[in-house]
Amino acid sequence: MEKFEGYSEKQKSRQHYFVYPLLFQEYIYAFAHDYGLNGSEPVEIFGCNNKKFSSILVKRLIIRMYQQNFWINSVNYPNQDRLFDHRNYFYSEFYSQILSEGFGIVVEIPLSLGQLSCPEEKEIPKFQNLQSIHSIFPFLEDKFLHLHYLSHIEIPYPIHLEILVQLLEYRIQDVPSLHLLRFFLHYYSNWNSLITSMKSIFLLKKENKRLFRFLYNSYVSEYEFFLLFLRKQSSCLRLTSSGTFLERIIFSGKMEHFGVMYPGFFRKTIWFFMDPLMHYVRYQGKAILASKGTLLLKKKWKSYLVNFSQYFFSFWTQPQRIRLNQLTNSCFDFLGYLSSVPINTLLVRNQMLENSFLIDTRMKKFDTTVPATPLVGSLSKAQFCTGSGHPISKPVWTDLSDWDILDRFGRICRNLFHYYSGSSKKQTLYRLKYILRLSCARTLARKHKSTVRTFMQRLGLVFLEEFFTEEEQVFSLMFTKTKTIHFSFHGSQSERIWYLDIIRINDLVNPLTLN
């Protein structure tokens, strides 16, 4: 613990960056706007036609920020006609979004400088940082076959927005910037709303993507820290299947308080954490802890994770957010797949001289299947089929041209095959393909006021078949039975293929986003 405190103080001395003056620079907001337009997910400014950037409004924003006692009066008298004027929807939305995007860029500057200028240290070695979704595929194919139990964790959202601000106090030693963030969140959510509400999360993610990602990633890094710290202290073996987590200065105080409440708990905890085959991976607000230990060990892990997170963040973590599964007896949801590790029995007849006998061989196989019921339900909600999977026409698309209708149906079908190309069985995909193809034919027939048979005879089935089965030439990662990895540019293959660009269409994981 003394080593941890010394390391934390050393890191704290490097974080004296003052970013508040940058908020008054016009180029920061211009850069935020350009980044939003050129990024993969553009920033939508309400009230601005064609997303045009208004430098006049930004200058007006900076002038008002320079006014004496502006922030104090804004907090004490929020109903006055100040920066965020509720009576003028355009100015209110514009200022809130452009300020949040600019603030998101400014607070990332000290973190980037710390990563670039951090000297080499030998006191606490850094762990391998696997920040790419592509590292999940080798983890699935290689590690899961040798593990027994899995803990599926849903990372909880913080109860109060103040917790998100407090998490930044360690890395950003700039009080005015933190006060500005508090004021902005106070305006945006009235400071009394819970971030756990779907409305607050949706608004933050939709209108303030950069700021929301920064706050959420900071929170997740702190949430993961105590897991890595305990795991590192419990064993001399390094945890290589995880990411790099950030330290915080108040952890030692939390541990001392926890030790007073539960004497002797820490020493017992360390013993139960000594599993050298513990693997960790995080994705899309969820995490997985897989190990080769016993069920008792996994239950201990669950209990300690709940208790430590409660005292670490000062809010209650629901135990049902951590589910225990035995890999050989149950399936688990992972990146939109239903995954499992079944045991396949293979009988081999062995002939030795005049005697023959049977050898019962058991082999584990990592199996990934496509969840049929959720995807059919998503297509039903998007009005492509009924609840039982019977294809129907989509009336809202009949006003489009024939090419647009074919393009929309074909894009959905190709994305489904593209994303679920890592599935072991393709029967569900062919069923979805049948639903979309017949729904497309019914939509076109309804548009031309014809029957499906007549329209298909005129259009030709060959065109639809070729349209739905064409594959783009993308970079893929294929695992063979000999544990060798092949990188190639190709289309459809009989082997299980993980395409490296599926992160761009990961909305397919959420069935509600298909429409």
Swiss-Prot record:
Chain segments annotated as transmembrane: none
Localization (cell): Plastid, Chloroplast
Predominant place of localization: plastid
Keyword Protein transport: no
Domain of life, source organism: Eukaryota
GO function term, MF aspect, one: RNA binding
Keywords: Chloroplast, mRNA processing, Plastid, RNA-binding, tRNA processing
Pfam families xrefs: Intron_maturas2 (PF01348), MatK_N (PF01824)
Alphabetical GO biological process terms: mRNA processing; RNA splicing; tRNA processing
InterPro entries tied to this protein: Domain_X (IPR024937), Maturase_MatK (IPR002866), Maturase_MatK_N (IPR024942)
Coiled coil: none
Cellular compartments per GO CC: chloroplast
Similarity field: Belongs to the intron maturase 2 family. MatK subfamily.
Function per UniProt: Usually encoded in the trnK tRNA gene intron. Probably assists in splicing its own and other chloroplast group II introns.
The protein's name in its UniProt record: Maturase K
Gene: matK
